[in-house]
């Protein structure tokens, strides 16, 4: 019990400490808001510093959109049309520009911006050097900002296969790509695509393989209007990892964590194998020899009127069960030409309240004991049943044992091809390389600086997220955090409630016996009345002891000193005799306890103190 109490005290201490820390956070937030409102300074954007890679770095592509960048130089806008769609939406007529975001946090930091919504957009750029999937790790990284949020649309990159760089002006949805990577959202939740297009070396077909990923990523990346960093790393072993803002989102291996499986089955069903004409797959058939019984009447209804039923004695057939509401009034805007004749709504008839019913009484219906329904022949086992037919298995002529990078075509260009219902989507710092160190270095020089400045801008304009909002945003990315919050808040509260309001242990009475030996107070009557009743009983004792038939009090006659001395001596001798008699009746621990009744017969009766003992147990 002591350990439990200490545990509850410790939990309460942790909870109070957390609340105090939260209060400190909120106080700091309030101070910042107050300071911002009273002493608000104009936000001054920091100056953009161009990222620099080491001299040893040789990225395949890197564009941070420096000042002076224009559409048509590095990035070529598509002039193609989508196939198999209406002509009015077939064109890639979405507008692009290179510029600053609507809210500038870093002066001179530009990006590639989607300027229109509800249109098809396509734009592409040629890599400085092609990326061949051999022994090098593949890394693609970029940051994206949905300034207006995202209702429905993408924000992903397509790493175009070799040959696409020759005609970027005709880049479209059917242009071959090797990897597609990036965010996509339509509705309340989104996903971060990772799709590989892998070539079968046996038959030359190229198929899409989707990486397995979380089903509930949330909507924070699209709806918080902040910049987010997306990074993909694919290693020659087939291992891949997807991270957002430097934190792992999901990971796996091309050989085992894609859908469909990259390795084809060794055996397949023979498509030329056809089911024989006489193959019977019916396990049970109707018994043709069965005959409907003569007493089977299909015309009998399922229920019939209960002829034994009688009308209840309090059934009132003169009253209707429902009547027009007498308090209802026709609406003032009621037009009988348009709405028809107005009728008051029906309500329960108050005259029928408490009765079995009103209106015309009808006998209830019961199940018809003669009902059998439609007769059907029973089922019997099919003697010609051969089982479920399946085509025979043959060796898969297109089977191969894949190697992670063997079926990935070289990448020569990067493109953005998407439909979106939102505008002002900004792409920036697009990097394709074989060096994870380069991607980390670029992120430190670009994204993390931008993230810090965006937070500073939000705080200066009063748009920063509070403590609770950050908690909720975290659950969008990781819904399982709700369980953690409940465990951290609800369980301590329950523990504190049990500790504070749980069942209390009963106090040990101060008159409890410490041994089984008989004691002189075993025959005393327990306290059965409260203090107020004790006072009343005490007063009654005083009244009984008062002399005089009338109950009036008179002053006692004075006694001389000799009489007082004799009285005191007599009282002393009586007290000594009583104590000796009590000692005689005390049972030693090694002797059996005498019955209470026997002891009571031998004990002297004290009639004057009976009421007093009844009033208080311990006296």
Curated annotation (Swiss-Prot):
SUPFAM superfamilies: Concanavalin A-like lectins/glucanases, P-domain of calnexin/calreticulin. GO terms for biological process: endoplasmic reticulum unfolded protein response; ERAD pathway; IRE1-mediated unfolded protein response; protein folding; response to heat. Disulfide bonds join 152-186, 352-358. Glycosylation is important for its biological activity. Expressed ubiquitously in every blastomere of the embryo up to the gastrulation stage. Expression becomes gradually restricted to the head and tail regions at the comma stage during embryogenesis. During postembryonic development, expressed prominently in the H-shaped excretory cell, in the neurons of head (including ASK and ADL) and tail (including PHA and PHB), in the dorsal and ventral nerve cords, and in the spermatheca. Expressed in the spicules of the male tail (at protein level). Its main location: endoplasmic reticulum. This is Calnexin. The gene is cnx-1.
